[in-house]
Regions:
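Extracellular pro-sequences of secreted precursors
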Residues: 19-251
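Bacterial Sec-dependent N-terminal signal peptides
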Residues: 1-21
Length: 251
């Protein structure tokens, strides 16, 4: 019984993988999106992003066969009626008070013609069968313009333990529904720059730890692209020590 169950799981996974077809830009071999920190300071964070291709999946719509575009480690933009394209978040540490703005310093792209990209079905409850949700087409399907218009944006600042952070949202793919052109940004240099000390959700009067436990340090390294530049400011607690607890006899 167990062997049969595992066989079924393997079969379903194979179907899921085979449903998507990899389209490489320079090579046929799949390569996930690459991010690289170029520089990081209190006033500026510069990141390079390289994209080697995308996955396409054919779906049936009332307008015929269309494509859903996706990428590894990316999330679909959940805007109902908009072209179903993925976005990629990059988490970064920002100043405790900083208001940041984002800009594309330079970029390169490749256009794919005669591509029909399906619209997103948006967000809905897990109790709803996705196949029961119809495809609807938003106003952008009537506009001769690329969507999204920007290739990067900033999320709301948030506090994670010792740091104030912000997500750099990267949009490597954009689509013009009128010309049926899919634009793939194969390279982007993105800068998040401090413009003031009037940012929202400021980290005020919160003491930062001088020592960071190894597991927390590992969390920071995985999450924040610019965390290594902070390492010289903090010492890490490499091993657990003994604790002295003082209390009255009743306890």
């Amino acid at each position: 019984m167990k062997k049969t169950f595992l066989t079924i799981i393997a079969f379903l996974l194979a179907l899921s993988i085979n449903a998507q077809e990899w389209v490489g830009i320079n090579k046929s071999v799949h390569k996930r999106i690459q991010e690289k920190l170029i520089s990081s300071s209190e006033n500026s964070i510069i990141v390079d992003v390289d994209i080697n291709g995308f996955y396409k999946e054919t779906v049936k719509t009332d307008k015929g066969d269309m494509l859903i575009i996706s990428g590894e480690d990316m999330a679909a933009m959940p805007i109902k009626g908009a072209p179903n394209l993925p976005m990629y978040p990059i988490s970064m540490i920002v100043g405790d008070y900083a208001e940041m703005e984002i800009a594309i310093i330079k970029s390169e792209y490749v256009d794919f013609e005669n591509v029909d990209v399906a619209p997103s079905k948006g967000n809905f409850s897990r109790q709803i069968n996705p196949d029961d949700v119809p495809y609807t087409y938003g106003d952008m399907y009537q506009e001769d313009a690329f969507y999204p218009a920007q290739q990067a944006s900033l999320g709301e600042p948030y506090i994670l333990r010792d740091f104030r952070a912000q997500n750099m949202m990267v949009y490597p793919y954009s689509y013009n529904p009128v010309t049926k052109t899919l634009r793939v940004y194969t390279y982007m240099r993105i800068e998040a720059k401090k413009v003031s000390d009037n940012g929202v959700n400021q980290k005020v009067n919160r003491k930062r730890n001088n020592k960071v436990a190894p597991e927390v340090n590992a969390l920071y390294e995985r999450r924040f692209i610019n965390y290594p530049s902070k390492e010289t400011r903090y010492s890490f607690l490499e091993e657990e020590g003994e604790m002295l607890i003082v209390c009255v006899d009743e306890y």
